[in-house]
């Protein structure tokens, strides 16, 4: 057994093999203000305001500090206030990780309790750099704790380690213990940072064919756990906003088949705001329906007097033509508190466009000026209604 990584997630009474390393970059040197929900909006930077953000899942996946800083500086220059990025990168076998960066290892044969943390140069230090640079450039982060999908260590690595699957994961004791211990590690490491906007339970959690109570109970329990660790920062679910109306039209977004009920989950007191995503092409809808989806979630947010965030949206082609109407609906017709396009793209000196995808909006392009720069300006100048 090669104990290259420090041990986390140990059972009560067990002693860690190594002492947790301090952050590799300066953290905790930014402003004292903590973002919070105020009615249907957010107070950020000491002001209740609308704002735009972006997704950039790959920030911590870069091995070069200069490239991380380049991306963060361009995001800040755009006028974005918040970046949603992965707070996880996990593997089962550290001797053959299959990816350049990994923060966590799930393997019961290597670690008591099953969870190890990589403190090497391609481990948690990469996220330290992201958090430190976010502080320096005065932007905030939504850190997501797990992935419903298999990319870069999702539920699949828990399945490999503990025998759970995509639906039993939410109630599997070993999986949930390791998941909570990882949350505890991340929250305790960064809760003193001014760069944290919110903690997020997962990226697009689903439980296909399950009763919505499975996700609801899991989200209620885990969000309460996070609030015990950190009473200051917000917590979100990270779901796609699926709806379960009793008399729905039976189509995918309204049939509850993914086991997620956006309305029910918004009732959870320890979730500070709701999230919804939009990918009409993948879901079997026409693009014009997207604006209706935005309006529906805005109306639900009004009912609960909670912020809702249009947290992901994208198309594989004709970005400006297809996505701009959704942005204009958000700006002109709703009180959606913020929106985060999927996703920020740039050309990096070493990595190039390695981590982009067909939805990426690349810095410096004509479409970026419209969908990123102009939209961030529109959201920033939008007036918050007086109550």
UniProtKB/Swiss-Prot annotation:
One Pfam match: Cellulase
Catalytic activity: Random hydrolysis of (1->4)-beta-D-mannosidic linkages in mannans, galactomannans and glucomannans
Glycosylation sites: 107, 165, 286, 318
One of the protein's GO biological processes: mannan catabolic process
Active-site residues (renumbered): 204, 312
Keyword tags: Carbohydrate metabolism, Disulfide bond, Glycoprotein, Glycosidase, Hydrolase, Secreted, Signal
Family matches, as InterPro entries: Glyco_hydro_5, Glycoside_hydrolase_SF, MAN-like
Thermal characteristics: Optimum temperature is 60 degrees Celsius.
Organism superkingdom: Eukaryota
Gene3D superfamilies linked: Glycosidases (3.20.20.80)
GO molecular function list: mannan endo-1,4-beta-mannosidase activity
Entry's localization field: Secreted
Cysteine disulfide links: 207-210
EC category name: hydrolase
Residues where substrate binds: 86, 203-206, 240, 279, 283, 342
Protein's job: Endo-1,4-mannanase that catalyzes the random hydrolysis of (1->4)-beta-D-mannosidic linkages in mannans and heteromannans. It is a crucial enzyme for depolymerization of seed galactomannans and wood galactoglucomannans. Active against locust bean gum and gum guar. Also has efficient transglycosylation activity. Produces mainly mannopentaose and mannoheptaose out of mannotetraose. May even prefer sugars as acceptors instead of water.
PANTHER family for this protein: MANNAN ENDO-1,4-BETA-MANNOSIDASE B, PTHR31451
Assigned protein family: Belongs to the glycosyl hydrolase 5 (cellulase A) family.
The protein's name: Mannan endo-1,4-beta-mannosidase B
Species: Emericella nidulans (strain FGSC A4 / ATCC 38163 / CBS 112.46 / NRRL 194 / M139)
Taxonomic path: Eukaryota, Fungi, Dikarya, Ascomycota, Pezizomycotina
Gene that encodes the chain: manB
